[in-house]
């Protein structure tokens, strides 16, 4: 009787391990499909394409001389009051790609 219970427990343990291995293999297939899907967007998620990390551009509230100094969707702005006359990069009210 004890042997039969031991064999049953070992059988259940082996079935658990087999099903777990199958699930892990399925997850790796899903991960490969997800990576292929992201790659099919053609670099939509690349930050360089959107101008975020353009070399030499000024980020929000950074100093600037002209609009060309600021990153994408930012323009060189200035305040009218003399203490705040230093130009800075601010949002130019545009969306999407330019």
Curated annotation (Swiss-Prot):
Tissue-specific expression: Expressed by the venom gland.
Highest rank taxon of the organism: Eukaryota
Signal peptide: 1-21
Disulphide bond pairs: 57-71, 64-76, 70-89
Pfam families (alphabetical): Toxin_12
SUPFAM superfamilies tied to this protein: omega toxin-like (SSF57059)
Record-linked InterPro entries: Huwentoxin-1
Keyword set, alphabetical order: Disulfide bond, Ion channel impairing toxin, Knottin, Secreted, Signal, Toxin
UniProt GO MF annotations: ion channel inhibitor activity; toxin activity
Protein name per UniProt: U11-barytoxin-Tl1b
Naturally occurring in which organism (per UniProt): Trittame loki (Brush-footed trapdoor spider)
């Amino acid at each position: 009787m004890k042997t039969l219970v031991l064999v049953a427990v070992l059988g259940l343990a082996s079935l658990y391990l087999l099903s777990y291995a199958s699930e892990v293999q399925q997850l790796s297939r899903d991960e490969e499909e997800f990576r292929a899907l992201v790659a099919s967007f053609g670099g939509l998620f690349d930050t360089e394409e959107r101008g975020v990390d353009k070399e030499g551009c000024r980020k929000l509230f950074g100093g600037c001389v002209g609009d060309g100094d600021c990153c994408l969707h930012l323009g060189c702005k200035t305040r009218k009051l003399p203490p705040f006359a230093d130009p800075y990069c601010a949002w130019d009210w545009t969306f999407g790609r330019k």
